[in-house]
Amino acid sequence: MILLDNIEDPHNLGAIIRTANVVDAHGVIIPKRRASGLTATVAKTSAGAINYTPVAKVTNMTKTIQELKEKGMWFVCADMAGTSMYQLDMKGPIGLVIGNEGDGVSKLVKENCDFIASIPMKGEINSLNASVATGVMAYEILRQRL
């Protein structure tokens, strides 16, 4: 499952839905407000994945995480200050939380995650586009499960 904490760019949302499909995620969860909706741009960028990948809109992301935790899911959020994703065991039922393009994962959502994961980087720039970060982390989760 991929949860998006206020992703605003419809191109990012479409690319993430496409990634969710190719890594066989169960779906994508987005907030009802303060984020990109399911627009024609999202559909086009998803390259058709929007037709096969469930997308749920929720009112409260934190409450959604808490409810899914009660059903046995664990949550890992992407953050530059986290533990290297290669050091985490992400083989079980994982919800991958990706934050807003400018602000990252909100404080309350981050506090409800079980792990905070970072993507090791070498260059002068220390951040990735939200959809790229989603792809890198989603493929690490998939790799661990193979």
List PLM regions with ranges.
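Post-transcriptional modification and biogenesis factors for structured RNAs
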Residues: 1-146
